[in-house]
Amino acid sequence: IDFLGEYTTERTQADTTRDTYLRLLAQLSDAGLSQAGRAEVSIKLSAIGLFLPQAGHEIALANARAVCEAAAAAGTTVTLDMEDHTTTDATLEVLRELRADFPWVGAVVQSYLHRTEADCRDLAGAGSRVRLCKGAYKEPASVAYQDGDEVDLSYVRCLKVLMAGEGYPMVASHDPRLLEIARALAHEHGRTPD
């Protein structure tokens, strides 16, 4: 579940978004929907303070940590959404910091970015949860593939890295060709379709 919103510019809004996630996780737990992977939450760091002018990184990290604590108490997980390319390094840094206490925190990576195959290699370790998507933001050619076929080829390269790794790859696509390739790679690497 993803509470939509991004690029918060006020601390009160960042904290309100955090509190919305905390209430959501409590409600999911009360309804019995958070256990055994039935529901998880995804969060955009810019929605919880990443770009605030004063201490944005620290505020986003503290807010994400509070959401992770609530998710752990509810028996579910959190995935950090990826936003435009300007947030990638900061998102991966927060991910590293959160995983010190919450090793199950996942991350989204976007195949249309030139850097993503290398990011997949870095994230494919044991216990790592990685959701691969194509990407939805308008990005310049200097950082992202512009041709749909190039994006798809990158998606497949990233899938190969993630499926061969020791982590938990999550496939985010509506494309029947990519889903079939994902099934074949999962089978090749002895993965089950959970």
Segment roles from a protein language model:
Residues 2-194:
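Positively charged, amphipathic and often flexible ligand-engagement surfaces
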